[in-house]
A protein has these predicted regions:
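Short, surface-exposed "cap/lid" segments of acyl-processing enzymes
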Residues: 1-52
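Short beta-strand/loop motif that positions the catalytic acidic residue
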Residues: 135, 140-147
Length: 202
């Protein structure tokens, strides 16, 4: 017996994990209303609008706010999120988008060769973290030139070094803009969605 028309369920063909920033050390719970999380909710929403149902966009919610070496709490949480999706997607169809500490988390996750591209927004890379990203990974770094919390010159130099290793790596500066991606918000969103859409051919 038939009950109405068939329902076409769209199965995503790619996945984007959105990784918020945080602190070097903190055991304070990470809450959705904190700026680092709210800002990346907006990035995730922009990605969903641009990419549609063809791409699954997930924002990772860390348990605590800190990087917390040597526990690496944020890496553990993001790694669990990656483990939850990677059995459904080809590694080349998984993109990591990380802001600040989230850019450092992305570099750590990319080291395993299980993702195709990394977009690092104002990344916190204090120890040449870009060196962890395999040469097979595509990389875009976007950094405000007036950022005083993470170093745009360092991320630019590290991106250049990544290119020397064979990565398809590019660095883009947003002139006069600081760390939190509040000024010229539309440009941050446009550069993010353009990169991911072009990489995934959406």
């Amino acid at each position: 017996m038939a009950f109405g028309s068939e329902i076409n369920v769209v199965k995503p063909r790619a996945c984007v994990l959105v990784l918020p920033g945080g602190r070097v050390r903190s055991d304070e719970a990470s809450r959705w209303w904190q700026l680092a999380n709210v800002r990346m909710m907006m990035v995730a929403a922009a990605l969903r609008r641009r990419l549609g149902r063809d791409v699954e966009v997930r924002r990772v919610q860390y348990r605590v706010r800190g990087w917390n070496s040597p526990r690496y709490d944020a890496v553990a949480d993001a790694g669990a999120a990656l483990d939850a999706v990677r059995h459904r997607f080809d590694p080349k169809s998984i993109v990591l988008v990380g802001h600040s500490m989230g850019g450092r988390v992305a570099a750590r996750l990319a080291a395993g060769g299980q993702v195709g591209a990394v977009l690092a927004l104002a990344p916190y890379w204090p120890r040449n973290d870009v060196d962890l990203i395999p040469a097979s990974t595509r990389l875009l770094v976007v950094h405000g030139t007036a950022d005083t919390r993470t170093d745009p010159d360092s991320s630019r130099i590290q991106t250049w070094r990544a290119r020397q290793r064979g990565l398809d790596a590019h660095w883009v500066g947003i002139e006069g803009v600081g760390h939190f991606m509040v000024r010229r918000m539309g440009e941050w969103h446009r550069r993010t969605t353009d990169f991911v859409a072009e990489y995934l051919q959406c």
